[in-house]
A protein has these predicted regions:
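Short, small-residue-biased leader/transition segments that mark boundaries at the very start
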Residues: 1-6
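A short helix-loop-beta-strand connector motif used in the catalytic cores of GNAT acetyltransferases and
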Residues: 43-56, 73-75
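Conserved active-site alpha-helix within GNAT-family acetyltransferase domains
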Residues: 108, 128-145, 153
């Protein structure tokens, strides 16, 4: 049984360890550039905590995953190339989804939680992040096109309407 809870400042060390594990996994599976240059760092996590947007996924009392979920407009989603969003209504955005690698089902647990909060969700991922693309598509997200994050890096954009 998974449960999702807002994470607190005292969880930062564990979350940073999960991000390190996720980066190592991505690098070992052909995605060496998605989370480079120290991203995501503690400052981003603290900002997410202060805004009430960061969550941990807990299994048997252990933090096994993390994600950020924000309802409202995502600045990098204002321009989409090679396609379009399914709808233009209010949506939630999932960012920084990562797993400790200890248990399976972290992405699904995140998606199921988020879709209960709002019926329209958007997410993006790196073209080399095949594991995340698979999880996103397996859940039923629709590939919409390409967006560009801060710094100009391209991401594949998806949305889901329940």
């Amino acid at each position: 049984e998974f449960r999702r809870v807002l994470f607190r400042s005292e969880d930062i060390e564990q979350i940073m360890a999960i991000f390190t594990t996720a980066k190592e996994y991505m690098a070992a599976h052909g995605n060496k550039t998605q989370w480079g240059d120290g991203y995501p760092g503690e400052e981003i996590l603290k900002t997410d905590i202060d805004a009430g947007n960061s969550y941990v996924i807990v299994n048997n009392g252990m933090i096994v995953g993390t994600f950020s979920f924000i309802i409202g407009k995502e600045p990098t989603y204002q321009v989409i190339k090679n396609g379009k969003w399914t709808d233009d209504r209010l949506y939630g955005t999932i960012h920084r989804l990562a797993s400790s690698g200890i248990v399976k089902g972290i992405a699904r647990a995140c998606f199921e939680y988020c879709i209960k909060q709002i019926d329209y969700i958007r997410i993006d991922t790196h073209k080399d992040n095949i594991s995340m693309q698979t999880a996103i598509e397996r859940f039923g997200f629709h590939k919409c096109g390409n967006i560009y994050v801060k710094g100009g890096a391209e991401r594949i954009a998806y949305d889901y309407i329940s």
